Amino acid sequence: MSWLNDTLVGFDLETTGTVPAESRIVTAALVEAKGGEVVRERGWLANPGVPIPAEAAAIHGVSTERAVAEGRPVAEVADEVAAALCTHWRDGVPVVVFNAPFDLSLLDAELARHGLASLAERLGGAAPGPVLDPLVIDRAVDKYRKGSRTLQSACGIYGVELAGAHRAGNDALAALRVAIALGRAYPAQVGELDPTALHARQVDWDRDWAADLQSWLRRSKDPAAVVDGGWPAR
């Protein structure tokens, strides 16, 4: 049976910045859906313990003042989010994350910062998964398409509504629906694969993409360029 009509969980973080090792969680969401229809949604607002830069607040709408007044300690949020993710993985439920290395690496960095067990440690040493990453899948199945590869652009291409971009719950659900749309558009490459097999294929796809990008950068811009292709976390 295809995973397209089964339970999936969309995951998204909104953060203080764009560097996973340094940025902090501001909001998080897990959206459970079956066949693309929402069954349950969980959301968190964290006090990241550092000021939220104005440019980040302008994107996701959470100011430092609001995070301090309404947010929970970021360590508690990170721990709860990690526990929930690992429960889904233990149950065999695929987690959909657009640009998974950002969100999963940032979550692991946040856990380490507060002396909490990593995702792998919570899974008995196993890597997180299965993960479905619409960004990695889209780059592989439509390799030569020009233009942006953001979640917003993917929604436009695959006919998914995204109301209120950069709100964690909205982005998580949109990513989940883009994954389903990709599976339907590319059944042999995506939709008909078992989620575990698709996870493994994405590891290869991301590695190949990184190698191609690194080669292009070295030829055209920087002979010493290095592109890290670790997926789903770096």
Task: Name each model feature, range by range.
Residues 40-60:
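Short, surface-exposed acidic-centric catalytic microdomains
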